[in-house]
C-alpha cells in the first residue's frame, strides 16, 4: 500500500470504525496485517448497513463515515487488464478486498468465506447482503452462483437461471 499501512488496518480504522456496527465485530489479522481465517466477521445486519453506507456515501456529498478515496477507488473504471476471476464476468477485478464487477454499471461485491457476500450497485442504490455456508472456498462455481443471484435480485425476479 502507498502509505505503508496494511489494507486490513486501513479497512478497520478508516471504514469499519466509522460505520459504527451495532453488534460485536471480529477481525483477525497477524502483526503484518494479513487477514487470518477470512479476516472479518460481522453480523448480517451490520454487513448490510456497511453496504448501505457505501451507497449513501457515493450519492451524497457528505462522506464523513466513508473516506472519499475509498469510494472513488471502488467505482473507478477498470484499470489495465488484471488477472481474471474465474466464475465472474470477464473484466471483474479485485480492489481493496472488494471485487469491481464487470459491466457498465458501478457494481462491487465483498465476497466472504463460504459464500457470504455483500453486493452493492451504486447506480441502482441496491444492497444485497447474504449469509451462506457453502462447503468450499471461493470455487468458480460458487462465484458464478453468487453472480447469478445478484443479477436475479437486480432484475426483481425470484428465479435464477
Regions found by a protein language model. Give the residues of each.
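A small/polar active-site loop signature that marks catalytic segments
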Residues: 1-29, 37
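Non-transmembrane alpha-helical segments in soluble domains
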Residues: 12, 16, 48-55, 71, ...
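A conserved catalytic-loop motif detector
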Residues: 52, 60-79
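Active-site-proximal alpha-helical segments within enzyme catalytic domains
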Residues: 38-59, 116-132
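Structured C-terminal helix/loop/strand segments within mature extracytoplasmic catalytic/sensor domains
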Residues: 107-161
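A structural signal for well-ordered alpha-helical segments within the folded catalytic domains
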Residues: 9, 45-48, 143, 147
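Active-site Gly/Thr loop motif
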Residues: 21-25, 71-128
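Structural helix-adjacent loops and short alpha-helical linkers that scaffold large soluble proteins
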Residues: 1-12, 58-66, 139
